[in-house]
Regions:
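Glycine-centered flexibility motif
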Residues: 8, 42-43, 104, 155, ...
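Conserved long hydrophobic alpha-helices within structured protein cores
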Residues: 9-12, 107-116
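Short amphipathic beta-strand and strand-loop transition segments with alternating hydrophobic
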Residues: 16-22, 99-107, 164-166
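Short, low-complexity polar/charged micro-motifs in intrinsically disordered terminal tails
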Residues: 211-212
Length: 216
């Protein structure tokens, strides 16, 4: 992971991401990301548990405090560990909270994509989210989101997500390079995934608050 400001100054981080479905056949994930470098971030971690019927649960653990802190849904627009992603960016959107419109089709990175506009209709989400609209470029053949434009509630384009370097792993396409650009401050965060391992039989207890606070 690399953070870069408008002067070109870079800050590099290393982290390990663990992910598992909450239950077989249920499309809700448990995710744990634990940082290992730089030294001041070693052991810092974020745990996300997706929920179908309520906002996702997220906890932040900072070793210096020896305890975790639950992130309230009202803070979903805070920066995720100081990156250009917000906490709401790393949680899956719940389909029934949005209205979707097919806006057309365009090329993105040489791929034919459907362009989808996504607007929140849930009243609580409207208040808590920083965004008023998202515009998504989706590759229908590979089922990949290659770009997302984020607009604020005034309709101003504020952030852009792009993804590339697709790889077919066990019959499913995955993207190994992603970038989030904050256009307001010309700051970007890029993530390069490597050493992916699939179907490792991760213990569900790995995704517990107790384990989060153990720093394991």
């Amino acid at each position: 992971m690399t953070l870069q400001d408008k002067e070109g100054t870079r800050n590099t981080r290393e982290a390990t991401l663990y992910q598992r479905q909450r239950a077989p056949g249920i499309d809700q994930d448990m995710r744990l990301i634990r940082f290992s470098s730089p030294a001041e971030m070693d052991g810092s971690a974020v745990l996300t548990l997706e929920n179908s019927d309520r906002p996702d649960d997220q906890w932040l653990y900072l070793p210096a405090y020896h305890t975790s802190r639950k992130i309230p849904s009202s803070n979903r627009s805070d920066r995720y560990m100081g990156t250009d992603f917000f906490y709401e960016d790393v949680s899956d959107d719940k389909v029934d909270q949005f209205e979707f419109t097919l806006a057309g089709s365009e090329q993105q990175d040489g791929r034919h994509c459907l362009v989808i506009e996504q607007v929140p209709i849930d009243e609580t989400l409207k208040k808590e989210s920083f965004y008023g609209k998202k515009r998504l470029w989706i590759d229908p053949e590979r089922l990949l989101t290659l770009r997302i434009d984020f607009s604020d509630k005034s309709g101003v384009l504020v952030k852009r997500f792009t993804a590339s370097s697709p790889q077919l792993i066990q019959g499913r396409w995955r993207l190994n390079h992603v970038e989030m650009l904050d256009m307001r401050i010309s700051h970007r965060t890029t993530i390069d995934y490597r050493d992916r391992k699939i179907d490792q039989g991760l213990n569900p207890q790995l995704f517990s608050v107790r384990n989060l606070e153990r720093g394991q």
